[in-house]
């Protein structure tokens, strides 16, 4: 086991602070509309240019072991804030540094760290309650665009693109970000339910130019086993012909042999307008997705587990959809004729499963199912001239998207660091002793850090800006882009309440942990022996010198 080094009390805390400062100094320059870029070296390829706080934080590893521990803890604040709220990483880092630095003065002067931490926790609770009072719900597409624009470093085009995507697929819809193939940003919306299974035979296509099968006003048969025998399908097909021969989409585990051949022949002869695809997913997820399609289209899954055979299927078991489009790789069901109440109940059930699951993979798959049921999928394709620019832009779009979802979830407050500053000014906290009051004061002081940093990056005097905003009315803040004091809601400078809340909670959580640290244990690097000098033998003639 490697030897360990231990440092105590003030020495440990000061070394931790040095590490936190190094990380915070690199991250804070990106803050606000006039924030600067940071250049990150890559082990291969071109350097990465970013204005995204969490990307900068992730790159930082310090040589000094105790300093590095401090930096890693604050890096955790940035990552956790990004994971939970999608944005606010720079705010969280700046706050964590401010809490630790401010608190260290009092701890060094003899305050009790545990009592100080209690006071800090009380202050955070009070500020969050105040933020919730200040919060307004997002009412229109324009506000969504404003939130997204700010998160994308004031890129209006990205803001408008995200607002349009949200508008098209609804707040539960899935919006994904991909690297585009052109210079322009593009939005592609898939309405209805789409799954990644294409037709089983190209003979099913109805449009040979586009190579797609389009079925209008179609019936949908859902079966959870393989279909290989035609006689199982015949009773149902006969009923369909008698009922007016509507188009039919068959979704089953697989369709092969005689059954597939017969369907293809009947399709080519014009007897049936039919298309067959495999069911999406595997195992239990396949059953769940078939059930989703059944609810969306108002049909039943024919399953032997439920005592049903394919031969017993009737027209009443079939789902219906206004339009089905099947290409080589995907099937899209638009305008499913399912019962609205049943669809809502299924959506609520999936939301509950998302809350309860502990697996990230399961959560992602459940969210995909939720989106497919509740509106559709939008894909934002990011365009740029170079790969470096593409990556930087994609970072910003991802940030903006997460912040927008957070705004829809918990509402919005004024931006520019003004919301937590004003919320802290209005709080009153019951404290039990002087040290708890110190904890409250530390947080009240620390919440000025974000607005001061935004002002500093824009070239204004930080102290004066913070004081003026604190004294102004509740909606007035500082527009760092123009240098004016404005009504932030009217100017469209807004932040999601969730982002502010989570940034503050995480920052104070780690800041107070660092303050209550009394010792730091690190590994002592082993001294590796210097490599031996190479043998000089064979150098004939050297003795003549």
From Swiss-Prot:
Q: Which GO terms describe its biological process?
A: protein refolding
Originating organism: Nautilia profundicola (strain ATCC BAA-1463 / DSM 18972 / AmH)
Function recorded in the entry? Together with its co-chaperonin GroES, plays an essential role in assisting protein folding. The GroEL-GroES system forms a nano-cage that allows encapsulation of the non-native substrate proteins and provides a physical environment optimized to promote and accelerate protein folding.
As for subcellular location, the record says: Cytoplasm
Summarize where ATP binds, as residue positions: 30-33, 51, 87-91, 416, 479-481, 495
Q: What is its EC number?
A: 5.6.1.7
Q: What class of enzyme is it?
A: isomerase
> NCBIfam families from the xrefs?
GroEL, PRK00013.1, PRK12849.1, PRK12850.1, PRK12851.1
Which SUPFAM superfamilies does the UniProt entry name for this protein?
A: GroEL apical domain-like (SSF52029), GroEL equatorial domain-like (SSF48592), GroEL-intermediate domain like (SSF54849)
Q: Which GO terms describe its cellular component?
A: cytoplasm
Family matches, as Pfam families: Cpn60_TCP1
Q: Report the family membership.
A: Belongs to the chaperonin (HSP60) family.
The UniProt keywords, alphabetically, are:
ATP-binding, Chaperone, Cytoplasm, Isomerase, Nucleotide-binding
Q: Can you provide one Gene Ontology molecular function annotated for this UniProt record?
A: ATP-dependent protein folding chaperone
Q: Show the catalytic activity.
A: ATP + H2O + a folded polypeptide = ADP + phosphate + an unfolded polypeptide
The record's listing under PROSITE patterns reads:
CHAPERONINS_CPN60
Assembly, per entry: Forms a cylinder of 14 subunits composed of two heptameric rings stacked back-to-back. Interacts with the co-chaperonin GroES.
What is the protein named? Chaperonin GroEL
Give the matching PANTHER family: 60 KDA HEAT SHOCK PROTEIN, MITOCHONDRIAL
**HAMAP family (UniProt xref):** CH60
């Amino acid at each position: 086991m490697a030897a360990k080094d231990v440092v105590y009390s003030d020495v440990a805390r000061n070394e931790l602070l040095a590490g936190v400062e190094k990380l915070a100094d690199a991250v804070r320059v990106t803050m606000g509309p006039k924030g600067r870029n940071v250049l990150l070296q890559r082990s291969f390829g071109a350097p990465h240019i970013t204005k995204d706080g969490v990307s900068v934080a992730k790159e930082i590893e310090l040589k000094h072991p105790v300093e590095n521990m401090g930096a890693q803890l604050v890096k955790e604040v940035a990552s956790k804030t990004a994971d939970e709220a999608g944005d606010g990483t720079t705010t969280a880092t700046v706050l964590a540094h401010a809490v630790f630095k401010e608190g260290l003065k009092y701890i060094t002067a003899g305050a009790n760290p545990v009592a100080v931490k209690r006071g800090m926790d009380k202050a955070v609770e009070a500020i969050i309650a105040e933020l919730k009072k200040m919060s307004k719900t997002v009412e229109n597409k324009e506000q969504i665009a404003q939130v997204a624009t700010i998160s994308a470093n004031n890129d209006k085009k990205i803001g408008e693109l995200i607002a349009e995507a949200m508008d098209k697929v609804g707040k539960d819809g899935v919006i994904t970000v991909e690297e585009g193939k052109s210079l322009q940003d593009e939005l592609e919306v898939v309405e209805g339910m789409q799954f990644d299974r294409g037709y089983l035979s190209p003979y099913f296509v109805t449009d040979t130019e586009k190579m797609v099968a389009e079925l209008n006003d179609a019936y949908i048969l859902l079966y959870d086993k393989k279909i290989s025998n035609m006689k199982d399908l015949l009773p149902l097909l006969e009923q369909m012909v008698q009922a007016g021969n509507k188009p039919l989409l068959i979704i089953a585990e697989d369709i092969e042999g005689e059954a597939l051949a017969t369907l293809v022949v009947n399709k080519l002869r014009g007897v049936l307008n039919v298309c067959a695809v495999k069911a999406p997913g595997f195992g239990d997820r396949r059953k769940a997705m078939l059930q989703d399609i059944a609810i969306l289209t108002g049909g039943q899954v024919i399953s032997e587990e439920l005592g049903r055979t394919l031969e017993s299927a009737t027209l009443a078991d079939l789902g219906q959809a206004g339009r089905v489009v099947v290409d080589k790789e995907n099937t899209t069901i638009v305008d499913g004729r399912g019962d609205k109440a049943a669809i809502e109940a299924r959506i609520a059930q999936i939301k509950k499963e998302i809350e309860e699951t502990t697996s990230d993979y399961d959560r992602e798959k459940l969210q995909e199912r939720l989106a497919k049921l509740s509106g559709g999928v939008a894909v934002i394709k990011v365009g740029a001239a170079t790969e470096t620019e593409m990556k930087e832009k994609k970072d910003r779009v991802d940030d903006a998207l997460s912040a927008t979802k957070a705004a829809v979830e918990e509402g919005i407050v004024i931006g520019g660091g003004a919301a937590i500053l004003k919320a802290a000014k209005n709080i009153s906290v019951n404290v039990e002793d002087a040290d708890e009051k110190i904890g409250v004061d530390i947080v009240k002081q620390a919440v000025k850090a974000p607005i001061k940093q935004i002002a500093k990056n824009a070239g204004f005097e930080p102290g004066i800006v913070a004081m003026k905003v604190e004294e102004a009315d509740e909606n007035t803040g500082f527009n760092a882009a123009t240098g004016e004091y404005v009504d932030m809601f009217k100017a469209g400078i807004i932040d999601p309440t969730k982002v502010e809340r989570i940034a503050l909670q995480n920052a104070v959580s780690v800041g107070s942990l660092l303050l209550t640290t009394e010792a730091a244990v690190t590994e002592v690097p082993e001294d590796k022996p210097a490599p031996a000098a190479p043998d000089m033998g064979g150098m004939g003639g050297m003795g003549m010198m």
